Amino acid sequence: MGGFTEKQEALVNSSYEAFKANVPQYSVVFYTSILEKAPAAKDLFPFLANGVDPTNPKLIGHAEKLFGLVHDSAAQLRAKGAVVADAALGSLHAQKGVTDPQFVVVKEALLKTVKEAVGDKWSDELSNAWEVAYNELAAALKKAF
C-alpha cells in the first residue's frame, strides 16, 4: 500500500457524513445485509435475536460505533500509516470466535450500506478507501486477539 492518501481520507469522511445523516435507516441496511449473507451472525449480536429492529437502540449504537471505528481508522492511516485497535475490542472479537469469513461478510455489508448512503457519488475509488480502512481495522483487531 502506498499510504492512505488525503483524497481517500476525504472520501471516507464525506461518505461517513452521509451515513450519519440517517443512522437508523442505514443500520437496518447494514444488519439486514449481514443476516442475508450469514444468518448465524445473529448469534454474535445479542440485539439481533429477534431480527433487525429499527427501533432497537443497541442495533443503531453498534452500527454507529462500527462505522465510526472504520472512519477513525482512515484518519489513523492518513496520520500514522497504521491502525491501532483497542485490545479489549480485539479480545471481545476473540471471545466471540469471529472468523475471517465473518469479517468479510461485515465488510461487504459495510460497503453496501455506504453505497446506499452516498447514492450516485459511489465509485470504485470510494469503495477502495473504505475497504482499505476496514481491512486495516480488521487486521489490527486480529492482532489484538
Curated annotation (Swiss-Prot):
Main location group: cytoplasm
GO cellular component: cytosol; nucleus
Example GO biological process: nodulation
Post-translational modification: Nitrated in effective nodules and particularly in hypoxic conditions; this mechanism may play a protective role in the symbiosis by buffering toxic peroxynitrite NO(2)(-). Nitration level decrease during nodule senescence.
Top-level taxon of the source organism: Eukaryota
Binding locations of O2: 62
Annotated positions of the Nitrated tyrosine modification: 26, 31, 134
Keywords (A to Z) from UniProt: Cytoplasm, Heme, Iron, Metal-binding, Nitration, Nitrogen fixation, Nodulation, Nucleus, Oxygen transport, Transport
InterPro entries: Globin, Globin-like_sf, Globin/Proto, Leghaemoglobin-like, Leghaemoglobin_Fe_BS
Residue stretches in coiled coil: none
Compartments reported by the entry: Cytoplasm, Cytosol; Nucleus
Tissue specificity: Root nodules.
Globin domain: residues covered: 3-145
Gene3D superfamilies registered for this protein in UniProt: Globins
GO molecular function, one term: oxygen binding
Binding site for heme b: 65, 93, 96
Function: Leghemoglobin that reversibly binds oxygen O(2) through a pentacoordinated heme iron. In root nodules, facilitates the diffusion of oxygen to the bacteroids while preventing the bacterial nitrogenase from being inactivated by buffering dioxygen, nitric oxide and carbon monoxide, and promoting the formation of reactive oxygen species (ROS, e.g. H(2)O(2)). This role is essential for symbiotic nitrogen fixation (SNF).
Family assignment from sequence similarity: Belongs to the plant globin family.
Quaternary state and interactors: Monomer.
Record's protein name: Leghemoglobin
Gene source species: Psophocarpus tetragonolobus
